[in-house]
C-alpha cells in the first residue's frame, strides 16, 4: 500500500445512477492510497465485482478493499447485517487465500437481518405480484424489513449478540410481531424461535472478535495520517429519499450518508467521486426514460446488454439498458455535491455507429432539464437526445486520454459539459489497470 498523498484525506465513492455502475473496481483501484475502506449503507443486496489479473471476485457485504493486503475494512452502523451471509462471504474469501478476520471490523450498532425479515420480504413481493399491484423489485434478502425495524426502534443489533438473555427476550418479541404479519396478512408460515436463537448464538461467537466502534477507528486513522475510502452501495437514483420512489432501496445511498452511516462528521468527507456508466442500466421495476429494447439481436439495447454482460451481481437478473441520461445525472450531482466523476464501461460503446445522450425531457408539452421527483412524471417524460458519431477503434485497456479515439473524447467532453461536473477518471475495461486518470481523488 502506498502512502497517502495527503494526511487524513478521505474519499467517498457513490453511484450516480440505479446502481451497478462499477463502483467495486474503482474502490479497489483507489484503495492503493487508503488505510481503510468503509461500507456505510445497504446490505448484501449490493453486488461489487472486482477483476484482478483476470480473476473475477464478487463481494456483497464486505468492503472491496479486502482484496488489498493490509487495508482495514469497516462495516459501518448504516449497514444491515445478515450474520449467516457475512460469515459465508468471509469463509469463501479465506478459502481463496484472502485474509479477512484480522482486518474486518463491524459496528456494534448495525441492525441484524434475521430469517423472518427474509420471509416477510419474499411474501410481500409474492403478494404484490398476485394482487396485480406489481413488484417493487427487491432482492428478497430481508433488507427492507430490517430497516423498518431499525426505524421503528425495535431492531436487534449486532451488540445484542453479546448478551444472550437480552437477545432472547428481544427476539421473542420481534418474532411474535413478524409471525403475526406473516400469518395474518401475508398468508405465509410462521417461524420457530429455537433454530433462529441457536444459530444466532453460534454466529455470535465467531463475530465477537470483529466488533468495533467504527466511528472512533476512522477518527484515529485520520489522526494517524491515514486516508479512508467510503464505499457506497446501489446508486443515487435508488436512494430512499431522493430516488425514483417507491422503486428504490431502503437506505440512503447518497454521499451525505457516508458520515451518518459510519459514525463521523461531514467534515471528514473531503472528495466525492461519482461513478457513472457511459450508458445507463437498471435492475428491477421502475421508470427509466432512456431505456432501449434489448431482445432483438443487432439493436443497440442488445449490444449494451451482451457486450456489457449486464446481469445483476447478486440476483443474476438481466439489467435493463439504455442511453446515458444526463438530466438524471444532474439530479445526482445536485444531491451528492460531487467533486468529480469516473465514467465506466466506455469500452462497451466501441463499434456503435451512433451514440445518443439524453439531455432533457419533454413533459406535458414543456422542456425540462433535470429528472423530476415524481415517479409518475418520470414515466410520462419523453427523452430529448443529442447524437454523436461512434468510433471503430477499441478503447479496451486504454490508460491515456490522448490514446482514446477522437470521437470517444468528444463524447466524454460533451458529457462533462452537459452535466456540469469534471470527469476525473475513465474506466476502459474490467481490470484495475484499465483506467485513465485525469485527476487523482487523493491528490485533487
Curated annotation (Swiss-Prot):
Main location: cytoplasm
Annotated pathway: Purine metabolism; AMP biosynthesis via de novo pathway; AMP from IMP: step 1/2
Gene of this entry: purA
Record EC number: 6.3.4.4
Stated name of the protein: Adenylosuccinate synthetase
Keywords for this protein: Cytoplasm, GTP-binding, Ligase, Magnesium, Metal-binding, Nucleotide-binding, Purine biosynthesis
Cofactor(s) listed in the protein's UniProt record: Mg(2+)
Residues bound to IMP: 20-23, 45-48, 139, 153, 234, 249, 317
Record: residues binding GTP: 19-25, 47-49, 319, 345-347, 427-429
Protein's organism: Methylibium petroleiphilum (strain ATCC BAA-1232 / LMG 22953 / PM1)
Active site: 20 (proton acceptor), 48 (proton donor)
Catalyzed reactions per annotation: IMP + L-aspartate + GTP = N(6)-(1,2-dicarboxyethyl)-AMP + GDP + phosphate + 2 H(+)
